Amino acid sequence: MKLTINGEPQASSAETLGALVEHLGMKPDRVAIELNREIVPRDQWPQTPLHDGDRLEIVHFVGGGSESPP
């Protein structure tokens, strides 16, 4: 099926959001996903089906240290 992920067209055989996250090699605890302009809670990913033409925005969380101001 054809999906749009972060504005880029991609083909995928994943049938659910959970399978897509696994297929893309993402760490589930480090991303948030919006499917067709709706944020999908992480616990719903395994049973959230994907359909041809779906649009996803995937945000990666990156940890960092704190810097002291000069």
Regions found by a protein language model. Give the residues of each.
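Ubiquitin-like/PB1-type beta-grasp interaction modules and other compact soluble beta-rich domains
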Residues: M1-P70
